Swiss-Prot record:
GO function terms (MF aspect): lyase activity; metal ion binding; phosphoric diester hydrolase activity; toxin activity
Known EC number: 4.6.1.-
Organism: Loxosceles spadicea
Described function: Dermonecrotic toxins cleave the phosphodiester linkage between the phosphate and headgroup of certain phospholipids (sphingolipid and lysolipid substrates), forming an alcohol (often choline) and a cyclic phosphate. This toxin acts on sphingomyelin (SM). It may also act on ceramide phosphoethanolamine (CPE), lysophosphatidylcholine (LPC) and lysophosphatidylethanolamine (LPE), but not on lysophosphatidylserine (LPS), and lysophosphatidylglycerol (LPG). It acts by transphosphatidylation, releasing exclusively cyclic phosphate products as second products.
Keyword Ribosomal protein: no
Cellular component, GO annotation: extracellular region
Compartments in which it is found: Secreted
Protein name: Dermonecrotic toxin LspaSicTox-alphaIA2ii
SUPFAM superfamilies: PLC-like phosphodiesterases
GO biological process: killing of cells of another organism; lipid catabolic process
Family classification: Belongs to the arthropod phospholipase D family. Class II subfamily.
Tissues expressed in: Expressed by the venom gland.
Requisite cofactors: Mg(2+)
């Protein structure tokens, strides 16, 4: 999965997919009442990027729905996975459950079209703080109460705080999550980060008894760091330059080992070599 980083304006969806992304990451900011409000990152952000592009969250969801609904004039068949980077740092811990409820209602109405031929992309809810694990239960309970538990088949989870792997496993246990887990690791492209924890996550994924199904690394913008990530065995790389990742995947060393994921590839299944 080539994951276009910080796709917060509707116009950027086409831009990143046309550069080779089959997945996008979108920032979600919340208001004081835990309502998802804007797709907005703000300053500071990755080097070489504008940090200030934004939409109202519900408007973005409608644009995303158009891009991921077969038959729509804006449909992009390659776009199969969306990571919502939930900026819950602005919330009190006791608002996490409420944020999950409100997120579920927004997605149900504006993305899934109340279960009636909505967008088809798989969704990852990426949470920066382990203490905010109740967001997951708020989300899953609400979709079930609203009569659409089947949509949870399209939803996965990530804790993005680079916490110790054991602590992340514990948070999932508390949240009642037993699958659909992506594990992120990384840092802004302005800084360097080694692959120690990525390798640990990959080992957990491949052990057959860990909690991780997929591993992604961010933010990967250079050919050398792309090769390092692929060599470490990641399932996804998040990037500001999808075309760079595509170029590396076409190199002799990688083109028979890796291919771009399609809609038929289940993002919750651990890949067995």
């Amino acid at each position: 999965w080539i994951m276009g980083h910080m796709v917060n304006a509707i116009g950027q969806i086409d831009e990143f997919v046309n550069l080779g992304a089959n997945s996008i990451e979108t920032d979600v900011s919340f208001d004081d009442s835990a309502n998802p409000q804007y797709t907005y990152h703000g300053v500071p952000c990755d080097c070489g990027r504008s940090c200030l592009k934004w939409e109202n969250y519900n408007d973005f969801l409608k644009g995303l729905r158009s891009a991921t609904t077969p038959g729509n004039s804006k449909y992009q068949s390659k776009l199969v996975l969306v990571v919502f980077d939930l900026k819950t740092g602005s919330l009190y811990d006791n608002q996490a459950n409420e944020a999950g409820k409100k997120l579920a209602k927004n997605l149900l109405q504006h993305y899934w079209n109340n279960g009636n031929n909505g967008g088809r992309a798989y969704i990852v809810l990426s949470i920066p703080d382990l203490n905010h694990y109740p967001l997951i239960k708020g989300f899953t309970d609400t979709l079930t109460q609203e009569g659409h538990p089947e949509l949870l088949d399209k939803v996965g989870y990530d804790f993005s705080g680079n916490d110790a792997i054991g602590d992340v496993a514990n948070a999932y246990k508390k949240a009642g999550v037993t699958g659909h887990v992506w594990q992120s690791d990384g840092i802004t492209n302005c800084l360097l980060r080694g692959l120690t924890r990525v390798r640990e996550a990959v080992a957990n994924r491949d052990s057959g008894k860990g909690y991780i199904n997929k591993v992604y690394y961010w933010t990967v913008d250079k050919r050398a760091s792309t090769r390092d990530a692929l060599d470490a065995g990641v399932d996804g790389v998040m990037t500001n330059y999808p075309d760079v990742i595509t170029d590396v995947m076409n190199e002799a060393a990688y083109k028979n080992k890796f291919r771009l994921a399609t809609y038929e590839d289940n993002p919750w299944e651990t890949f067995k070599k």
